[in-house]
Design a protein with these regions (language model features):
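Negatively charged, low-complexity tracts enriched in Asp/Glu with abundant Ser/Thr
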Residues: 1-13
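Mixed-charge, Lys/Arg-enriched low-complexity segments
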Residues: 38-90
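Generic cytosolic/nucleocytoplasmic N-terminal low-complexity/intrinsically disordered segments
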Residues: 1-4, 28, 43, 86
Length: 90
């Protein structure tokens, strides 16, 4: 993954990365990775890389099973609302 932006989390050794996926030779797509360190401090190869286009379906499936905590839902709604306002304004 060609990382273009990194977001820290509250968990030590865990960051969220956004960038161009390994499978996109043209660099026109985006993916997200939940990157975790391994025991030695290096990159855990089990850290999943997911196409941005898959996130909506994943979140809808998990939300449909009531598996997301209320506080996480609220934070997502705030972030998604802000994104929608930015997109509608442009």
């Amino acid at each position: 993954m060609n990382v273009t932006k990194t977001f820290p989390t509250q968990e030590v050794g865990h960051v969220i990365e956004i960038g161009h996926p390994t499978w996109d030779e043209e660099g026109s797509q985006f993916s997200v990775r939940s990157r975790r360190q391994n025991r030695n401090g290096g990159f855990n190869r089990g850290s999943p890389e997911t196409p941005i286009g898959d996130l909506g379906g994943i979140i809808a499936a998990v939300a449909g099973e009531d598996l997301i905590e209320s506080t996480e839902i609220a934070a997502m709604l705030v972030a998604l609302s802000a994104s929608l306002i930015r997109k509608l304004g442009s």
